[in-house]
């Protein structure tokens, strides 16, 4: 008998997610059983962990398992576990709301394209709600470990906007979920169909999965029913690598991550010696939708001596590898370990170092063995990996080998060129790795700063991701070669510079009075005015000194709401350009000033992508054109 019954409305995001999920995931509907068994396995893990300090929570029943039964006549499928269970408050929190930050943003990202929706929803992790793909009504009975028998909870919903919750009596600890299958989904109340799905998706979990199966005598006559274990019930990572198939590794990844897509690659290692641990690390094939959300949960599942301790243990991976999924099972950490203890622990630090190295080696091997697959990884996670040089000085060189860039040698914005590629084809006499940062690939590709480099056939890396400037403030050299921006006023090309030195000196003398005239006109608005011999088609550019903040770094500070120091540019004029020659000969001071202002504004526009006073610029152009 139920008491204290109430009907409540789903959180609006749940309603929306249920409808999208039922339609988008219908083609892969059998995954509902994998999701529910995974949840049951997690409930058992959590009970084991709590029982380490409170063994009475087992209530005399420490034989943890998942049981599945079905009633073909009624069209029901029931999944039950004797794990941690839930209180009334937990039921409302977990089954009535989605307690994930960024849920609204996630739902906004969903479009009308079904395949894309399916992939996004898979990344989000639908868990319990997947039951509604095949059921038109779901009933949950649950009692939390340690709670009295009369403090169990009944939850029911047809998935259409509301649910009911009531107090009931339940003798057994744990959770029982009954799916009232839709008419067209009655196949899931069939023993052999259930066996097939469990064999496919849940053979690898460490918890026994039992089904209520019919027994037969030697003549094939039915003699009764009994609970039969139908999975291996041995944690996959404890088995030897040689006996685990790729398919099993892939399904275990999906169990761990609740991702629907196969992983891109994985590494499974057992380490003995000073430290004893087993790690199973995966690289997903797709970035999660909330990878750049500050509250995005990441980290590895932590086990100690095969006992589950916690999800999302962030302490074992640096932030720039937050896309890595998997688990670590340590023999050296205490069973009563907490997040606080992990934070300041020598064992944790050693494990983090080893797992970071293992992850980078796995990616380096992929880059060498399968360039196409690596570029697929780079498209998904390259931006995150670019955080590495600022976070991990010890592995900076290894991270640098994994970076990929667009190049002036390619006609595509695709980031495919490594620093090793660049160094291998450097010109004789070239001492530096040259790059340019800009707001976009198009802006970088068409920057006037590239003109001399294109003329001399010197490769320049084209960087246009917002993080690039920040990354390069930490990554200043590679393989003994300095990384040098081509936008600096004091750029030294060394042996690669133009050979016409005498002719240039003559030009400097010829234009010296012109340069002084421009300096007088612009005054403190620029740091310096000089002639440049690195332009071919452009009349003027602006540049910064080595000790100054670059344009892109200033933009980065501004976007982050940080105070930005004033950037004073050096104004460089091309003495070979007909416009500069024309302006140098002007006697009328107003006309001279107008042209110099225009050339400066053009140079600023090319460098910054915007002007402080675009209206004045337009008026000046119109005035000079009329």
Curated annotation (Swiss-Prot):
Molecular-function GO term, any one: unfolded protein binding
Alphabetical list of SMART domains matching this protein: HATPase_c
One GO location term (cellular component): cytoplasm
Keywords: ATP-binding, Chaperone, Cytoplasm, Nucleotide-binding, Stress response
Cited CDD domains: HATPase_Hsp90-like (cd16927)
InterPro entries according to UniProt: HATPase_C_sf, Heat_shock_protein_90_CS, HSP90_C, Hsp90_fam, Hsp90_N, Ribosomal_Su5_D2-typ_SF
Xref: Pfam families: HATPase_c_3 (PF13589), HSP90 (PF00183)
Chain residue ranges for the region called A: 1-339
Annotated segments matching region C: 556-626
Location(s) in or outside the cell: Cytoplasm
Region called B, residue ranges: 340-555
Highest taxon of the lineage: Bacteria
HAMAP family named among the record's database cross-references: HSP90
PANTHER family membership: HEAT SHOCK PROTEIN 90 FAMILY MEMBER
Binding partners and assembly: Homodimer.
Job of this protein: Molecular chaperone. Has ATPase activity.
Family: Belongs to the heat shock protein 90 family.
Protein name: Chaperone protein HtpG
Organism ancestry: Bacteria, Pseudomonadati, Pseudomonadota, Gammaproteobacteria, Pasteurellales
Gene that encodes it: htpG
């Amino acid at each position: 008998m139920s008491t204290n019954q109430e009907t409540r409305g789903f959180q609006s995001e749940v309603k929306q997610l249920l409808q999208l999920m039922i339609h988008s995931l219908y083609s892969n509907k059998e995954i509902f059983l994998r999701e529910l068994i995974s949840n049951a396995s997690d409930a058992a893990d959590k009970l084991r962990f709590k029982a380490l300090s409170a063994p009475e929570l087992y209530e005399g029943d420490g034989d943890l398992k998942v049981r599945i039964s079905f009633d073909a006549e009624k069209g029901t499928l029931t999944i039950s576990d004797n794990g941690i269970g839930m209180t009334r408050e937990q039921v409302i929190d977990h089954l009535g709301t989605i307690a994930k930050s960024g849920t609204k943003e996630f739902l906004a990202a969903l479009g009308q394209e079904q395949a894309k929706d399916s992939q996004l929803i898979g990344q989000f992790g639908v868990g319990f709600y997947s039951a509604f793909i095949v059921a038109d009504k779901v009933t949950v009975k649950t009692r939390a470990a340690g709670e009295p028998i009369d403090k169990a909870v009944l939850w029911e919903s047809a998935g259409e906007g509301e649910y009911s919750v009531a107090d009931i009596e339940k003798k057994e600890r744990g959770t029982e979920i009954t799916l009232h299958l839709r008419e067209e989904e009655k196949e899931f109340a069939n023993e052999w169909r259930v066996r097939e799905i469990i064999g496919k998706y849940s053979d690898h979990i460490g918890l026994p999965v039992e089904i209520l199966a019919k027994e037969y005598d030697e003549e094939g006559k039915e003699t009764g029913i009994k609970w039969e274990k139908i999975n291996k019930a041995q944690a996959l990572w404890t088995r030897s690598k040689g006996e685990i198939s790729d398919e099993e590794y892939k399904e275990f990844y999906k169990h761990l991550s609740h991702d629907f897509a196969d992983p891109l690659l994985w590494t499974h290692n057992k380490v003995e010696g000073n430290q004893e641990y087993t790690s199973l690390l995966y690289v997903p094939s797709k970035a999660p939708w909330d990878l750049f959300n500050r509250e995005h949960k990441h980290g590895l599942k932590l086990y100690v001596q095969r006992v589950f301790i916690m999800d999302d243990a962030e302490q074992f991976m640096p932030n720039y590898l937050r896309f890595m999924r998997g688990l670590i099972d340590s023999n050296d950490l205490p069973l009563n370990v907490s997040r606080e203890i992990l934070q300041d622990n020598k064992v944790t630090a050693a494990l983090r170092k080893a797992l970071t190295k293992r992850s980078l080696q796995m990616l380096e091997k992929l880059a060498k063995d399968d360039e196409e697959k690596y570029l697929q990884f780079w498209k998904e996670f390259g931006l995150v990996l670019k955080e590495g040089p600022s976070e991990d000085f010890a592995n900076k060189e290894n991270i640098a080998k994994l970076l990929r860039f667009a190049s002036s040698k390619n006609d595509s914005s695709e980031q495919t060129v490594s620093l090793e590629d660049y160094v291998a084809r450097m010109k004789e006499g070239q001492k530096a790795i040259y790059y340019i940062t800009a707001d976009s690939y198009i802006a970088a590709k068409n920057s006037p700063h590239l003109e001399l480099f294109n003329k001399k056939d010197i490769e320049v890396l084209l960087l246009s991701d917002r993080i690039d400037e920040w990354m390069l403030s930490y990554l200043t050299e590679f393989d003994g070669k300095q990384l040098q921006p081509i936008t600096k006023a004091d750029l030294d090309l060394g042996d690669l510079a133009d050979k016409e030195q005498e002719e240039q000196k003559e030009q400097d003398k010829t234009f010296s009075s012109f340069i002084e005239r421009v300096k007088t006109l612009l005054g403190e608005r620029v740091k310096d005015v000089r002639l440049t011999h690195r332009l071919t088609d452009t009349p003027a550019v602006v540049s910064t000194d080595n000790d100054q903040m670059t344009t892109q770094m200033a933009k980065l500070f501004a976007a982050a709401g940080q105070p930005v120091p004033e950037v004073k540019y050096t104004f460089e004029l091309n003495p070979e350009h007909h416009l500069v020659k024309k302006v140098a000969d002007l006697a009328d001071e107003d006309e001279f000033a107008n042209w110099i202002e225009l050339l400066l504004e053009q140079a600023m526009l090319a460098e910054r992508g915007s002007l402080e006073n675009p209206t004045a610029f337009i008026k000046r152009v119109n005035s000079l054109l009329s």
